[in-house]
A protein has these predicted regions:
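Bacterial Sec-dependent N-terminal signal peptides
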Residues: 1, 5-43
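Short glycine/acidic-enriched loop and turn motifs that connect beta-strands
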Residues: 49-54, 107-109, 149-150, 188-189, ...
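Hydrophobic/aromatic beta-strand positions that recur at structurally equivalent sites within the blades
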Residues: 58-63, 112-114, 153, 191-194, ...
Length: 270
């Protein structure tokens, strides 16, 4: 199965090929006017929305032509009604298998919906801490990071079945490559977790903010002055200085998913 990550705010991640989106061909509709979701190719944008005024939202951009998209506003509320909402300050979303997972800092911290219709499947308000991110492992299991560690999520029962032992403090972005999940810890660096045993097998010390998995499977972790590239099989790593003008900023202050992602079509990072 292939997971698709969606970052909060204004970061866009397309699920088709890597083509520039031409802004003047995206016709936005008026605020607060929800539009129904149409099954078609396109991409999602998760919004933290306006803290103190509204909960998080998700918009859907449906492709009408190779360079033309139609925006569908507040799509989750359209599918489920105005009383069904995401949590407070939604910062992360991921498509895994048949579901889409929305992670928020407070309130409805984990919302699971059908990836095609956006119909609600489950809402969890307690996951062990304030929500951060989700990574799918297989058809039965995923991990949810939060401010106090990493929760193990059973996809079939939509329930938290435990916490990763030894993972403490705020955990941000996570990525699956091979048989390991790599998770960024604000305090301790990178946790390497065996997905069969749900045990931490290595901790890579350092100060890092976010990570992504490249098309060839390498783990790229953003630090203060450069990348840490990790081989997912040997777990060997090397430091690579940022190209000039391409540093990745910290995402810990008011946590967000960061400004780093990888192409699914080419072996490049954005």
């Amino acid at each position: 199965l292939l997971g698709l990550v969606l970052f909060a705010g204004f970061s866009l991640l397309a699920c088709s090929d890597d083509k520039d989106i031409i802004d003047d061909k995206i016709e936005l509709i008026a605020d607060d006017e929800p539009q129904p979701v149409t099954e078609s190719s396109g991409f999602w944008v998760v919004n933290e929305d306006w803290f103190g005024h509204d909960n998080g939202t998700v918009n859907y951009f449906r492709q009408q032509a190779p360079d033309s998209y139609e925006a569908m506003y507040r799509a989750y509320r359209v599918a489920n009604g105005e009383n069904e909402q995401l949590g407070v300050t939604t910062q992360f979303g991921a498509v895994w298998g048949e579901n889409i997972y929305f992670i928020s800092k407070q309130g409805n911290r984990l919302v699971v919906a059908d990836a095609e219709t956006l119909k609600k499947k489950a809402v969890l308000t307690e996951i062990g801490g304030d929500g951060r991110s989700f990574v799918g492992i297989n058809e039965n299991k995923g991990y949810v990071s939060h401010t106090s560690g990493i929760a193990v999520f059973d996809i079939k029962s939509f329930s938290i079945t435990g916490q990763i032992e030894g993972a403490s403090g705020q955990i941000g972005m996570m990525g699956l490559s091979g048989n390991h999940v790599f998770a960024v810890s604000q305090q301790n660096g990178i946790y390497v977790i065996d997905t069969e045993t749900d045990q931490i097998v290595r901790t890579i010390a350092g100060t890092y903010s976010t990570l992504t998995i490249s098309k060839e499977g390498d783990v790229w972790v953003a630090g203060s002055n450069g990348f840490l590239r990790i081989d997912p099989l040997s777990l060997d790593s090397e430091e690579i200085v940022y190209p000039e003008g391409a540093a990745v900023g910290s995402s810990w202050g008011a946590w967000n998913a960061g400004s780093l992602c990888a192409s699914t079509q080419k072996n490049v990072l954005y």
